[in-house]
Curated annotation (Swiss-Prot):
The active site is at 515 (proton acceptor). It comes from Pseudomonas putida (strain ATCC 700007 / DSM 6899 / JCM 31910 / BCRC 17059 / LMG 24140 / F1). [2Fe-2S] cluster binds at residues 122, 193. This is Dihydroxy-acid dehydratase. The gene is ilvD. GO terms for cellular component: cytosol. HAMAP family: IlvD. It holds the Pfam family ILV_EDD_C.
Length: 613
């Protein structure tokens, strides 16, 4: 049987000093024989997805202690991508993922914790904690803060979200009064932004990976049902500790649960629900931490056979996360994938012996359990609040319409090809990604003229100054993990293209990335990035570029000989932006850039550079 890791600091005469300090935290004699369970919280008043988490760590702690464990809470940082967007603050967003992963490792290993409850929610926090969990490989369970309710206003016929506020603000025909109304209505409650953006996508994927409870990704932050997820997480982590430390059951460890097949399940879910392209970046990073040989080629392979079964904002206006929950949540999508013969159902989860068992219990189309049906009727109250579990509104009926509803069957899929795709070509030899769920079918094949911008800032200025015309392909480069540094999100350029009426008339290609709120022909993660010698750095104004989503290709229509000549010329100049950027790159950002890999590797640290240290 494996010993408790905490035994290192709680047992033996020589640990009298450590025990004295543990006692100062409130531990008693009997506690030194119990598992010490770390609660990694991410409360902050900066982020609406985390503003309500302050007391939830202690809610979990009390449940852990009732079940026989010792709970010790700590906090990580959390960056709000929406607030950090559009200025140099976005340089810090992706690097914060690595800081969060390191912070969890530091706290858990420094104090020899036996297990972890990860209380996450927004864009980089769930991925960072996931990376740490797979790095540490001790019992873990994820429970997120939950999605925000969609906004409501009499000025719109559909639910609102953050992207609506951004688009209307850039629309010169909209009145100041309308902009103000959208601003006040778009984000009405605590929780992660209400569409299938990065935060909600990642929280849904933790269900598919088997590391979170059913409902984790879709139960509203404001709904009282979400409290039960936190309480159950506290009890479950103690049970996982008993199984591992008491019964030597390694099947409960994160690397046993989130193995290669589980990553395939998560990616198939992602493709089926049209998740954020950021999820590709984060799944690749997490797989590397778990030593899982899952890469961009696997994602490309899966994207060709998984249909799109769910469509949510920003890919469609009339559905948000509250509607996904009403339609049965993630386990209904997983159930559809299983019936289609795609899902690996023999895998364990933190709550069930197998995914097959979990689907049978939680898929509303398979179970008659009234408690499960009631759970998925949890809906929005439409009352602005920053308080968790503050309402108990329920829909009168479930959305079990698999022909025309939010979640579809294979036979009635939104499209037979899924919502994410990987493209390859001479402009991105190692690949780039596009959220096809947000691309109008009329522009799945698009040939356009390159319009070069050496930064997101210059692209925004160019778009707002009407320098971009129909038929252009906006190229934003030197915004990758190393070149930015930090791989900024390009939500403002894509939103402004939409507000200028160019959403279906232009494309955008970048070695940066996109917010989960992005839609349109927006292609990111071009690898290698420009700063690493990628061909995106060789494109010139006026070049023709051909994008062919059905054939998964993207090519600069320039001869190999011409590209070779340009490469020789660029090698002499150095792979740097052609224009000076007024950008303060601090020591912290330089340290990140020094080790950063391109997006096809998940933008993780280049471990080869650390070998021998």
């Amino acid at each position: 049987m494996p010993d408790y890791r905490s035994k290192t600091s709680t047992q033996g005469r020589n640990m009298a000093g450590a025990r004295a300090l543990w006692r100062a935290t409130g531990m008693k004699d009997e506690d030194f024989k119990k598992p010490i369970i770390a609660i990694a919280n991410s409360f902050t008043q900066f982020v609406p997805g985390h503003v309500h988490l302050k007391d939830l760590g202690q809610l979990v702690a009390r449940e852990i202690e009732r079940a026989g464990g010792v709970a010790k809470e700590f906090n990580t940082i959390a960056v709000d991508d929406g607030i950090a967007m559009g200025h140099d603050g976005m340089l810090y967003s992706l690097p914060s993922r690595e800081i969060i992963a390191d912070a969890v490792e530091y706290m858990v290993n420094a104090h020899c914790a036996d297990a972890i409850v990860c209380i996450s929610n927004c864009d980089k926090i769930t991925p960072g904690m996931l990376m740490a969990a797979l790095r540490l490989n001790i019992p873990v369970i994820f429970v997120s803060g939950g999605p925000m309710e969609a906004g409501k206003t009499k000025l719109a016929s559909h639910g609102l979200d953050l992207v609506d506020a951004m688009v209307i603000a850039a629309d010169s025909t909209a009145s100041d009064e309308k902009v103000a109304e959208y601003e006040r209505s778009a984000c009405p409650t605590c929780g992660s932004c209400s569409g299938m953006f990065t935060a909600n996508s990642m929280n849904c994927l933790t269900e598919a990976l088997g590391l979170a409870l059913p409902g984790n990704g879709s139960t509203l932050a404001t709904h009282s049902d979400r409290e039960q997820l936190f309480l159950t997480a506290g009890r479950t982590i103690v049970e996982l500790c008993k199984r591992y430390y008491g019964e030597n059951d390694e099947s409960v460890l994160p690397r046993s649960i989130a193995n290669f097949k589980a990553f395939e399940n998560a990616m198939m879910l992602d493709i089926a629900m049209g998740g954020s392209t950021n999820t590709i970046l984060h799944l690749l990073a997490a797989a590397q931490e778990g030593e899982v040989a899952f890469d961009l080629r696997d994602i490309d392979r899966l994207s060709r056979k998984v249909p799109q079964l769910c469509k949510v904002a920003p890919n469609i206006q009339n559905y948000h996360m509250e509607d996904v929950h009403r339609a049965g949540g993630i386990f209904s999508i997983l159930g559809s994938l299983a019936r289609g013969g795609l899902l690996h159902t023999d895998l364990p989860t933190v709550h069930s012996r197998s995914m097959e068992e979990a689907i049978a219990k939680w898929d509303i189309t398979q179970t008659d359990d009234e408690a499960v049906h009631t759970f998925f009727k949890a809906g929005p109250a439409g009352i602005p609040t920053q308080t968790a579990f503050s309402q108990s509104t329920r829909w009168e009926t479930l959305d079990d319409d698999r022909e025309n509803g939010c979640i579809r069957s294979f036979e009635h899929a939104y499209s037979q090809e899924g919502g994410l795709a990987v493209l390859y070509g001479n402009i991105a030899l190692d690949g780039c990604v596009v959220k096809t769920a947000g691309v109008d079918e009329s522009i799945h094949v698009f040939e356009g003229t390159a319009k070069i911008f050496e930064s997101q800032d210059s692209a925004v200025r160019g778009i707002l100054a009407d320098e971009v015309k129909a038929g252009d392909i906006v190229i934003i480069r030197y915004e990758g993990p190393k070149g930015g540094p930090g791989m900024q999100e390009m939500l403002y350029p894509t939103s402004y293209l939409k507000s200028k009426g160019l959403g279906k008339a232009c494309a955008l290609l970048t070695d940066g990335r996109f917010s989960g709120g992005t839609s349109g022909l927006s292609i990111g993660h071009a690898s290698p990035e420009a700063a690493a010698g990628g061909a995106i750095g060789l494109v010139r104004d006026g070049d023709k570029v051909l994008i062919d989503i059905p054939n998964r290709s993207i090519n600069l229509l320039v001869s190999d000989e011409e590209l070779a000549e340009r490469r020789v010329e660029q090698d002499k100049k150095g792979w740097k932006p052609a224009e000076v950027r007024p950008r303060k790159v601090t020591t912290a950002l330089k340290a990140y850039a020094l080790l950063a890999t391109s997006a096809d590797k998940g933008a993780v640290r280049n471990k080869a550079m650390l070998e021998g240290l």
